[in-house]
């Protein structure tokens, strides 16, 4: 417990919160160039081959970003848009690639949750009477 005099001299320090995606520098998205596309295995007890890409962001930082969805069109030297968001079972992967932006196509054949996977709305044929 501080004394009254200590509070007058130093005041109360407010705690600073640590950001979960420091490479974005308080921006919602950052663009970058894909350097490597690879698969990694998740932590126990899960088992899979998760697709990730190493991306050099526009602020010269290099991050590992997760590629969501089934099948992807991410290749080396593609321009990508990166957002924050951790992958729970992949240590060190704190970012997601936004599908349907820049050089990356959306997931084909998706009917629900299309906006998350960059899938365009299916065109309905209109018949004239």
Curated annotation (Swiss-Prot):
- Please list the residue ranges that the record marks as compositionally biased, kind Basic residues: 10-20
Q: Which UniProt keywords apply?
A: Methylation, Ribonucleoprotein, Ribosomal protein, RNA-binding, rRNA-binding, tRNA-binding
Task: Quote the InterPro entries the UniProt record gives.
Answer: NA-bd_OB-fold, Ribosomal_uS12, Ribosomal_uS12_bac
Question: Segment Disordered: which positions?
Answer: 1-25, 109-129
What Pfam families does the entry give? Ribosom_S12_S23 (PF00164)
Q: Which GO terms describe its biological process?
A: translation
Q: Matching Gene3D superfamilies, A to Z?
A: Nucleic acid-binding proteins
One Gene Ontology term of the molecular function aspect: tRNA binding
Spell out which residues are annotated as carrying 3-methylthioaspartic acid. Answer: 89
Q: Which GO terms describe its cellular component?
A: small ribosomal subunit
- State the function annotated in the UniProt record: With S4 and S5 plays an important role in translational accuracy.
Looking up HAMAP family in the UniProt record yields:
Ribosomal_uS12_B
Indicate the family of this protein: Belongs to the universal ribosomal protein uS12 family.
Q: How does it assemble?
A: Part of the 30S ribosomal subunit. Contacts proteins S8 and S17. May interact with IF1 in the 30S initiation complex.
Q: What is the recorded name of this protein?
A: Small ribosomal subunit protein uS12
Native organism: Rickettsia peacockii (strain Rustic)
State the encoding gene.
rpsL
């Amino acid at each position: 417990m501080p004394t009254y005099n200590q509070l007058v001299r130093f005041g109360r320090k407010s705690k600073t919160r640590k950001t979960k995606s420091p490479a974005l520098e308080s921006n919602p998205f950052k663009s970058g160039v894909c350097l490597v596309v690879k698969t990694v295995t998740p932590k126990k007890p899960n088992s899979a081959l998760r697709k990730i890409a190493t991306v050099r962001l526009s602020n010269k930082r290099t991050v590992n970003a997760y590629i969501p969805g089934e099948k992807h069109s991410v290749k080396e030297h593609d321009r990508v848009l990166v957002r924050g968001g951790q992958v729970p079972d992949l240590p060190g992967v704190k970012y997601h690639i936004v599908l349907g932006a820049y050089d990356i196509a959306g997931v084909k054949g998706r009917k629900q949750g299309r906006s998350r996977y960059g899938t365009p709305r299916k065109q309905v044929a209109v018949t004239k009477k």
